Each structure stands twice: as structure tokens, then as C-alpha cells.
Amino acid sequence: MASRRSRPQAASFRNGRRRQPTSYNDLLRMFGQMRVRKPPAQPTQAIIAEPGDLRHDLNQQERATLSSNVQRFFMIGHGSLTADAGGLTYTVSWVPTKQIQRKVAPPAGP
């Protein structure tokens, strides 16, 4: 009975339901290999996802959810997540401090 537990993430993708990415492996599974640079001495920008990595279109809430999860994992100050036809681009501005800020833009209404 070693394989009693099924793989919920695989089943969720098969059923078309998207679950929140909660770990680095989930992010890699969804968006492919990401490139991350260590925080430099002064604030700069880094793109940790290449165009074309997006497996599906993200709606506004999924963008906020993924943005929140990515920020929580990388312990960054603030960032912005944009999804378009080219793919996913997550741009972060590193802040030279150990304080963790969570800054997720509210969904844009019509």
C-alpha cells in the first residue's frame, strides 16, 4: 500500500482545475525553469521567467495568487506579474533589507 496516496497535482491538471502554486517545485512545474539572481547591493530588476513558459492564460486572481506565492518564496520586496501572448514575465525590484513586504496589486475592475 505504498502508493495509496494519489498525486493530487497531476489529477488537478488532468481535470482542468488549477490549484495554487505553493512551492518552488510547483512554480517550476507550471512555468518551466526560472532564472533567479541573488540580491545585489543596490536595487535592480531581475526577470525570473522567460517568454513562452506560460502553460495557460492567467486571469487576474491567478496573477495575484502567483505573485503573492512567488514573493513569499523568494522573500522579495515587491514585484509585478504580467501575462500576455509572449508568456509570463515576473519583474521584481530587490530591496536591500531583510524586511519582508507583501505588495499585491488588487484586481483591476472593468
Curated annotation (Swiss-Prot):
Localization per Swiss-Prot or TrEMBL: Virion
Pfam families: Arteri_nucleo
Region (Disordered) location: 1-24
Keywords: Ribonucleoprotein, RNA-binding, Viral nucleoprotein, Virion
Chief location bin: virion
GO molecular function: RNA binding
Gene3D superfamilies in UniProt: 6.10.140.90
GO cellular component terms, A-Z: ribonucleoprotein complex; viral nucleocapsid
Segments crossing the lipid bilayer: none
InterPro entries: Arte_nucleocap, Nucleocapsid_C
Entry similarity comment: Belongs to the arteriviridae nucleocapsid family.
Name under which the protein is recorded: Nucleoprotein
The organism of origin for this protein: Equine arteritis virus (strain Bucyrus) (EAV)
